[in-house]
């Protein structure tokens, strides 16, 4: 899973025993060489799906990390593009990754639960960040996103179908979450990262409570499971006009 240029086991251990913010500051220089980075195939599929409803004017990448979502927003947005993250280390890598982006791109250090914007965006995207939020934090998070979107704006993010109980992936994720719960019960500060806590039914309900109109769009690039359900969907939450 990790190449020779990725983090060592010791580096991952130090990260896991840190806070979320400090952990990602430490991991940032090697983050793009880990399996934690959202694959390009997912980014391209989301961009292709959103192109059918665009173009947009101003876009925000929520919890942008090292800037993987930047290419999606620059393809879709005619105006400004902003990345927001609370890790200074991740933002530093993002700035270095796109040095020629110019004034059209801005990077802002802030907590997604207290965004420093007014209704300034037509599109908000996020990739692979929701495991860092506990279920009880979703109402506040989605209310924040609703507040920074202009009327008619969209909040979009991909969701992969969970693995079946009979597959190794199911037990791997179950084991990871169990280890993290034990770690957080015994060690401070906590490191919030749970793969199985972000459940689509709960997410849709909380988005609607925050005032969004929610649609689920299959991402056909990833095919369907044996029961006919999509392997991947894009959640599109629209702020009413």
Regions found by a protein language model. Name each.
Residues 1-54, 72, 156-180:
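Conserved class I S-adenosyl-L-methionine
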Residues 186-200:
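Acceptor-substrate binding/catalytic loop of class I
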Residues 125:
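A conserved beta-strand element that flanks and buttresses the S-adenosyl-L-methionine
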